[in-house]
């Protein structure tokens, strides 16, 4: 294999790797958006649950665990 053929092969590999990196970056961005949306929904549901729990048993104090 000549030096020129090796150079061409390396350029092809670099181009393929750049494409893969771009695709993975796009997927990762979408996943972070999904995680953020799910986190917001979970927080809203947690708050709603605590409200309903307080309404169901108003004499029993509801306290969030320290990690909330």
UniProtKB/Swiss-Prot annotation:
It holds the Pfam family SlyX. It comes from the Bacteria. InterPro entries: SlyX (IPR007236). Belongs to the SlyX family. This is Protein SlyX homolog.
